[in-house]
Amino acid sequence: MKFFIFTCLLAVALAKHKMEHVSSSEEPINISQEIYKQEKNMAIHPRKEKLCTTSCEEVVRNADEEEYSIRSSSEESAEVAPEEVKITVDDKHYQKALNEINQFYQKFPQYLQYLYQGPIVLNPWDQVKRNAGPFTPTVNREQLSTSEENSKKTIDMESTEVFTKKTKLTEEEKNRLNFLKKISQYYQKFAWPQYLKTVDQHQKAMKPWTQPKTNAIPYVRYL
């Protein structure tokens, strides 16, 4: 009985020893296999690790540059902001003056138009009215009367001289007397009152302020 128990214990001990030896031998095999796989992966894909490292470095660099640019821009904006505030406060009056000047120059053509229209409304006689009738020259009555008197005086003086000096007339003087007679006949035929009336009517038509109301009286010709 004792021998049987001893053999069982011995068998169990041997079995444990074998199991430990197998497990211990399997562990280095597994470790060696893992190391081999890692070395194999490193040998097959060396570029991937390089790419990963370079891309990571670039990402880090870009992030650093962005942070630096953001900091610099924030610092510059902080420096520029008070200067801009000072400029706007100092130039308010200048900008107002410029705006007023621009508005004045924009409205300047309208002012010129109003100034041009004002005198025309106040002085309607400056606007010349064109009549459809024939134009008659404006002659003053005094000038006509003086010219008529002078012509009559000259004719009378020459006629008296002709009667007193009938014996001393020459051909040139005779021709002159004939010319003067023709002139006197022309002046006698010319209707002076009719001409003066036409001149007066034309002057009234050109100056409406002297006669605001026009009378529709028919024209009667003087004979």
UniProtKB/Swiss-Prot annotation:
Domain of life the protein comes from: Eukaryota
Phosphoserine: modified positions: 23-25, 72-74, 77, 145, 147, 151, 159
Sequence repeat residue intervals: 77-141, 159-223
One Pfam short name: Casein
Location within or outside the cell: Secreted
Main location: secreted
One annotated Gene Ontology cellular component of this protein: extracellular space
Leader sequence segment: 1-15
InterPro entries per the UniProt record, alphabetical: Alpha-s2_casein, Casein, Casein_CS
Transmembrane segments: none
Function: Important role in the capacity of milk to transport calcium phosphate.
Record-stated family: Belongs to the alpha-casein family.
UniProt-recorded name of the protein: Alpha-S2-casein
Naturally occurring in which organism (per UniProt): Ovis aries
